[in-house]
Amino acid sequence: MTKSPSTLGILLFAATMIIFFVVYYFFSGVEYFDISLKANAFVLPIIYAGAAFWSVKTYWNNHKTVSFRDAFKRAFVPMFIGGVLSILSIYAFLNFVDTDAKKLLNYQYVTRQKSELDKEYTSARKILKHQKDIEELDQKYKERLQSFTPEAVKGKDMLTASHFSGYFAAILIFYVVLSLFFGAFFRTRTIYQETEIKE
């Protein structure tokens, strides 16, 4: 059964929000930011890529000829609709419904950045031999620490509209690249099969 790209987009939106709220309700503790990051980095790309593939494949199965444009559209439109609706909904939820969750994510983001800085500093200090290099490293570390003082992190917000726009721009690149791949792949296979039939 071939679903329209817009229908698949709505289904992707629903799947994204289910994952978002599962993480929100069951993992909104000390690991909330890390688990959210992993879900966005590993789970959602697989779901979106799978949906895009299924969208193009089912269309290809039901049509003798599939142009690059058709294949690209069948892959891109569902991901775009699902992504836009998800970004808007998550932004609205964190900024207007549960601002405490937003504060927690921002706090854990800063904490994670500080932890990574400490790890880099510790590992770098172990391998340095010359006192001059160690002193330079210590100085740079102290300078970087200033960005984590209470005054520096007060009001720091990584979940503003501009940040969400940036996130979506990065996601959009993923959608375009994946759609280009599916467009080229299915168009090539169609031409190849038609050539074989003519022979």
Q: Where are the regions a protein language model picked out?
A:
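Alpha-helical transmembrane segments of multi-pass membrane proteins
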Residues: T7-L11, A15, K73-G82, G166
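Alpha-helical transmembrane segments of multipass membrane proteins
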Residues: A15-V23, Y48, G82-I90, F174, ...
